[in-house]
Structure formats: structure tokens, C-alpha cells
UniProtKB/Swiss-Prot annotation:
Protein's GO biological process: amino acid biosynthetic process; aromatic amino acid family biosynthetic process; chorismate biosynthetic process; quinate catabolic process
Swiss-Prot/TrEMBL keywords: Amino-acid biosynthesis, Aromatic amino acid biosynthesis, Lyase
Record's protein name: 3-dehydroquinate dehydratase
Organism listed in the record: Bacillus cytotoxicus (strain DSM 22905 / CIP 110041 / 391-98 / NVH 391-98)
Site (Transition state stabilizer): 18
Active site: 23, 100
Metabolic or biological pathway, per its Swiss-Prot or TrEMBL entry: Metabolic intermediate biosynthesis; chorismate biosynthesis; chorismate from D-erythrose 4-phosphate and phosphoenolpyruvate: step 3/7
Top-level enzyme category: lyase
Cited Gene3D superfamilies: Dehydroquinase, class II
Family: Belongs to the type-II 3-dehydroquinase family.
Record-linked NCBIfam families: aroQ (TIGR01088), PRK05395.1-2 (NF003805), PRK05395.1-3 (NF003806), PRK05395.1-4 (NF003807)
EC number from the UniProt entry: 4.2.1.10
Function comment: Catalyzes a trans-dehydration via an enolate intermediate.
Gene: aroQ
């Protein structure tokens, strides 16, 4: 069975209470449960990780190489300035799909740039929690499983 890692970065543990007008009322637990169910329907194992700490995200990305077939990553605010996470993504051999709940290109100007997108297989933004499912579908297509 193929295995995929879902990684959520800083403040995503606050989903459902943080800026619900931007991110919706769904919680991280709901998102992870829904994604595990979707992956199971597709015959894929999915494990989840969330951290507010850059180093923990980097370590998790490094450790995923060779264990998982790919990563779905929402780097949160690190998207816009973490060259360390960008380098971690570039250093692994498995594809990474970057996902954002909101459309980062319609928000504050500092959110318009993603330093991580250029080293990802693709980027999905603005579709709420459904964007994570789109990322899973895209990742499986990239892996030749769809």
C-alpha cells in the first residue's frame, strides 16, 4: 500500500477557532479524519503531522524520504519566508504538493509569494479543506496511481 504524509505547519492546530472567516469552522482533527477516509477509499495509507516549529517540520520532511511516496504540505506562514523548509523539500526525492486553505494570492501582499512552491510538484490554493483532497488526487496522479 502506498503511504502519503500530510504535514501541516504553524497555527493550523487552531483551525476552527482562528480566523474562521478565512479558514472556515472545520478543525484540524476533522481535516485529518476526512483525509484518512479519502485515502483509505483510494487504497492509500495516510499519516498526519502538525507542528508550530520550523525544525520539527524540516526533520519530518527529511525523515519522510524513503518511507512515504509523497507529502501533502501546508507550510502555513513558513510558505512566505522559510528557505530552510524550501531546502528540506529540495533535498528529498519524493514529490511534495503544497496546499493552502485560502487563496494566498488574494490576501495580504506579504502572503502572495511562496518560497517553497518552486521546489514542490505543484501548489493548490483557495479551495478550503477540499484543496487537501485535490492535493491527494494530484499526488496520486503524479505517482501514476490515479
Amino acid at each position: 500500500m502506498k503511504k502519503v504524509l500530510l504535514v501541516n505547519g504553524p497555527n493550523l492546530n487552531r483551525l476552527g477557532v482562528r480566523e474562521v472567516n478565512v479558514y472556515g469552522k472545520g478543525t484540524l482533527e476533522t481535516l485529518e479524519t476526512d483525509m484518512k477516509q479519502e485515502a483509505e477509499k483510494l487504497g492509500v495509507g495516510l499519516e498526519c503531522f502538525q507542528s508550530n516549529h520550523e525544525g520539527a517540520l524540516i526533520d519530518t520532511i527529511h525523515e519522510a524520504d524513503g518511507i512515504y511516496e509523497g507529502i501533502i504540505l501546508n507550510p502555513g506562514a513558513f510558505t512566505h519566508y522559510s528557505y530552510a523548509i524550501r531546502d528540506a523539500i529540495a533535498s528529498i526525492s519524493i514529490p511534495v504538493i503544497e496546499v493552502h486553505i485560502s487563496n494566498i494570492h488574494q490576501r495580504e501582499s506579504f502572503r502572495h509569494e511562496s518560497v517553497t512552491a518552486a521546489v514542490c510538484a505543484g501548489q493548490i490554493v483557495g479551495f478550503g479543506f477540499y484543496g487537501y483532497k485535490l492535493a491527494l488526487f494530484a499526488l496520486l496522479e503524479k505517482l501514476g496511481e490515479a
